[in-house]
C-alpha cells in the first residue's frame, strides 16, 4: 500500500510537471497560486489563468501588454490584484475595471502587495513608493490610486518588504537593514535596525518572525507586539 501510495504521488507530481511544461511552451512566464496557474502568452502577450488539470483557460487581461520581452507576474491576496514587471523595469498594474494593464512606473526593481491588500509597494534603485489601493478615511487620509514617496537614498536600495502590520517597511541599503513607518505626518521615523554584509530579509507574518541571511548564515528575531 505504501509503495502504491508513493508511486501514485510520484505519478501525480510528474503529471503536474508535464502540465506545467505544456503551459511553459506557450507562455513567457507563469506563476502558481494555490491550484491556479497565471501565465502570459507568447502569442498575444495577454494574461491567462488555468488550473493544474488544464480544465479551463480564462483570459484575464482584455488587451496585450504594451511591450514585449520577459516578465514577472506579481499577485496580491485578492483575485484582481495583479502587477507585471518587465525586464525593462516597467511596472504594469491591471486595472480591475477595464482589465487593461496600465503603466504604473518605469525603473522599478521589485513590487509587493501588502498582506491586507490595501497597498502596493514598489521600489527603484533609490526610491520607495506606496500605491494606495483603497480609500483610507482615518488619518492619514489617502485616496484610491494615490502614490506616495516613502523615502529616497543616494545608495542603492536592494530589497524592501512589509512588516506584518502592513504599516511599516524593512529595507536594505548597502549593509544596513533599516525600518520606516508609512505614516508621514510630522516626521517619518526611519531607523537603522541591523548591520550585516549583503543581507537578505524576510518576514514570517503568521509567526511574526524576522529572518535575515548574511554570509550564508540565517538569523531570526521574534517580533514583539
Task: Label the predicted regions.
Residues 4, 40-41, 84-85, 123, ...:
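Residue-level marker for isolated small/hydroxyl-bearing positions within beta-strands
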Residues 4-23, 44-65, 87-104, 129-150, ...:
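Surface-exposed loop/turn elements that mediate protein-protein interactions on large endomembrane-trafficking
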Residues 23-35, 66-76, 106-118, 154-161, ...:
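Repeated scaffold domains used in trafficking and secretory/extracellular systems
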Residues 72, 79, 85-89, 100-126:
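Extracytoplasmic beta-rich ectodomain segments of secreted or membrane-anchored proteins
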Residues 123, 143-146, 152-153, 164:
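Charged, low-complexity helical/coil segments in non-catalytic cytosolic or luminal regions
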Residues 152-179:
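Loop/turn-rich, solvent-exposed surfaces of beta-rich toroidal or solenoidal domains
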Residues 198-225:
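Blade-level signature of beta-propeller repeat domains, shared across WD40, Kelch, NHL, RCC1
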Amino acid at each position: 500500500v505504501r509503495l502504491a501510495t508513493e508511486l501514485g504521488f510520484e505519478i501525480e507530481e510528474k503529471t503536474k510537471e508535464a502540465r506545467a511544461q505544456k503551459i511553459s511552451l506557450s507562455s513567457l512566464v507563469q506563476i502558481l497560486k494555490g491550484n491556479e496557474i497565471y501565465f502570459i502568452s507568447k502569442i498575444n502577450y495577454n494574461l491567462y489563468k488555468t488550473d493544474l488539470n488544464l480544465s479551463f483557460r480564462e483570459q484575464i487581461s482584455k488587451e496585450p501588454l504594451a511591450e514585449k520581452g520577459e516578465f514577472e507576474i506579481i499577485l496580491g491576496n485578492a483575485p484582481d490584484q495583479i502587477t507585471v514587471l518587465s525586464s525593462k523595469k516597467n511596472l504594469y498594474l491591471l486595472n480591475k475595471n477595464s482589465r487593461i494593464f496600465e503603466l504604473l512606473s518605469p525603473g522599478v526593481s521589485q513590487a509587493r502587495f501588502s498582506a491586507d491588500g490595501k497597498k502596493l509597494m514598489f521600489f527603484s534603485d533609490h526610491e520607495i513608493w506606496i500605491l494606495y489601493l483603497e480609500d483610507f478615511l482615518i488619518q492619514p487620509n489617502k485616496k484610491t490610486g494615490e502614490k506616495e514617496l516613502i523615502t529616497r537614498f543616494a545608495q542603492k536600495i536592494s530589497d524592501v518588504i512589509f512588516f506584518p502590520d502592513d504599516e511599516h517597511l524593512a529595507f536594505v541599503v548597502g549593509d544596513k537593514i533599516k525600518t520606516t513607518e508609512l505614516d508621514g505626518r510630522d516626521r517619518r521615523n526611519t531607523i537603522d535596525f541591523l548591520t550585516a554584509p549583503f543581507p537578505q530579509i524576510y518576514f514570517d507574518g503568521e509567526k511574526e518572525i524576522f529572518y535575515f541571511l548574511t554570509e550564508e548564515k540565517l538569523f531570526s528575531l521574534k517580533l514583539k507586539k
